[in-house]
């Protein structure tokens, strides 16, 4: 897998990784990394996974921020990470309504399939910036638990229509990647998902 980033002077820097050379020991990866609370082996495993994801997702690295697009991520999840059922859903083109959108989220989370979710903040809409984060649960009130990827800061339960940690509100241009499960866990899927009643 090849990608390209830029150096501090804006010059292109190619990056290549052979994902066949990587094996990941998920049992060594911790849920949280705080200074003095992890070994070199656990740090190496999560660093290797982060690097492989970054390169294969065609991450654009910068000194102030880094990013990629959800469509690049879903292609890589299917091709390189053993998630053949991964699928990208774009809320702006989703025609089945908000209730069905939310039922898809609840269904995925009820089956222990975390969601990669993305949105664009009001303050970044003009410039096109956004943020990707993980939904990993929901509560009885229909709020989703969000891991923002900011060292645990602001992680908690949020309304999907707001997604408003601190000064942000990632309610624009939302999309999500569903179906992140290994083939051995996968159930038979169809092209159209219809949810009726409560999930």
Task: Give the role of each language-model region.
Residues 75, 79-147:
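Active-site-adjacent substructure of cysteine-protease-like catalytic cores
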Residues 25, 96-101, 157-159:
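General structural signal for secondary-structure boundaries
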Residues 38, 42-65, 104-113, 167-181:
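Short, Φ-rich (hydrophobic/aromatic) sequence segments
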Residues 1-94:
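Cysteine-nucleophile protease catalytic domains, especially the papain-like/related folds used
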Residues 24, 28, 35, 40, ...:
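Intrinsically disordered, low-complexity regions enriched in small/polar residues
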Residues 50-53, 67, 76, 116-119, ...:
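Generic detector of bulky aromatic hydrophobic side chains
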Residues 110, 125-129, 138-197:
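Cys-His-centered catalytic/binding microenvironment captured across papain-like cysteine peptidases
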Residues 12, 38, 56, 64-66, ...:
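Compositionally biased, intrinsically disordered low-complexity regions
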């Amino acid at each position: 897998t090849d990608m390209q980033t830029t150096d501090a002077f804006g010059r292109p820097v190619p990056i290549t990784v052979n994902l066949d050379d990587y094996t990941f020991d998920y049992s060594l990866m911790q849920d949280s990394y705080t200074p003095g609370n992890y070994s070199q082996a656990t740090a190496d495993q999560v660093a290797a996974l982060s690097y492989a994801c970054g390169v294969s997702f065609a991450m654009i690295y910068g000194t102030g921020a880094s990013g990629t697009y959800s469509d690049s991520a879903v292609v890589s999840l299917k091709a390189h990470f053993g998630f053949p059922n991964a699928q990208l859903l774009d809320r702006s083109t989703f025609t089945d309504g908000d209730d069905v959108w939310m039922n898809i989220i609840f269904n995925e989370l009820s089956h222990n399939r975390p969601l990669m979710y993305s949105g664009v903040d009001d303050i970044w809409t003009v410039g096109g910036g956004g943020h990707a984060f993980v939904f990993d649960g929901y509560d009885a009130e229909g709020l989703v638990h969000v891991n923002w990827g900011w060292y645990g800061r602001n992680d908690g339960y949020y309304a999907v229509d707001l997604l408003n940690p601190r000064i942000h509100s990632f309610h624009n241009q939302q999309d999500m990647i569903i179906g992140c499960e290994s083939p051995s866990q996968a159930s038979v899927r169809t092209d159209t998902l219809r949810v009726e009643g409560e999930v």
